[in-house]
């Protein structure tokens, strides 16, 4: 019978990989998890959690505007709207990162408490029972691939050089004055709401006639109207044909205006 370093090696310490590894260890297996970043995965580090934190923060600008109609204001404000307010983007990102550190630490503790070894580095499968991390090779009876997904750039000239993905959008050190978002799926729509809420001039460019393709038609129409009412500039029936800088994009119509 073959001898291995571990019963199970999991590549990826996201929600799925951590859970599977803990369950296996709980049944007596010797388990290692290989992770090139830190425990948490897409949801905790680059997806649901940081995005929802920014989304929640962006909603307060609308609350301030609504408050004016209910008599709230500052007699000493310089703003014509009656309320003087500002936003510390750097402070928001710092606090967001602190929360991600806390949650990643919880994932690390879950692995430690289950007796799962965490191996830092990028795992490369070298055989049916072997994975290389750096210069060292590890063996296991079973290898579980739980690496999740990763955003990609469309094959459009200049986009990869001058654009950013959702990963980088969550790590910006400053709030852009203006931003163009290509696509109108739920992730793009969420980011449009985030940057618009924080005061960025926001463009949403998409090929379809309405955002959120595949969703209920009435919902899509209502969403488009609500986004425009909030000041988001919609570009339906368009695609990006090239990018020359972060602030200069070329677009053209993909169908005639009727």
Mark where each language-model region is.
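Glycine-rich flavin
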Residues: 3-6, 22-29, 34-175, 208-212, ...
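Beta1/beta-strand and adjacent pyrophosphate-binding region of the FAD-binding site
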Residues: 4-13, 177-182
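N-terminal Rossmann-like FAD-binding beta1-loop-alpha1 element of flavoenzymes
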Residues: 8-32, 192-196
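Conserved phosphate-binding and hydrolysis motifs of nucleotide-dependent enzymes
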Residues: 12-17, 148, 183-188, 253
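Rossmann-like NAD(P)H-binding beta-loop-alpha module
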Residues: 174-207, 214
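Conserved small/polar residues in nucleotide/adenosyl-binding loops
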Residues: 247-256
């Amino acid at each position: 019978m073959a001898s291995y370093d571990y019963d199970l090696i999991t590549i990826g310490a996201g929600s799925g990989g951590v859970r599977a590894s803990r369950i296996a260890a709980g049944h007596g297996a010797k388990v290692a998890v290989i992770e090139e970043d830190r425990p948490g995965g897409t949801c905790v580090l680059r997806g649901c959690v940081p995005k929802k934190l920014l989304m929640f923060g962006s909603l307060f600008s609308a609350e301030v505007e609504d408050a004016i109609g209910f008599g709230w204001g500052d007699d000493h404000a310089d703003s014509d709207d009656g309320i003087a307010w500002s936003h510390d983007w750097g402070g928001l990102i710092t606090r967001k990162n602190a929360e991600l550190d806390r949650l990643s630490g919880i994932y690390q503790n879950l692995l430690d408490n289950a007796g799962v070894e965490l191996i830092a580095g990028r795992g490369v499968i070298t055989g049916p029972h072997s994975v290389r991390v750096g210069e060292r090779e590890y063996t296991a009876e079973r290898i579980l691939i739980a690496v999740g997904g990763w955003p990609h750039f469309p094959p459009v000239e200049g986009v990869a050089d001058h654009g950013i993905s959702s990963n980088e959008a969550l790590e910006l050190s400053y709030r852009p004055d203006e931003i163009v978002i290509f696509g109108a799926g739920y992730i793009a729509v969420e980011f449009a709401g985030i940057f618009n809420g924080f005061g960025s001039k926001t463009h949403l460019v998409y090929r379809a006639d309405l955002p959120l393709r595949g969703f209920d038609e009435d919902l899509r129409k209502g969403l488009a109207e609500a986004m425009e009412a909030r000041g988001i500039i919609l570009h339906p029936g368009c695609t990006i044909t090239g990018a020359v800088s972060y602030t200069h994009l070329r677009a053209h119509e993909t169908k005639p205006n009727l």
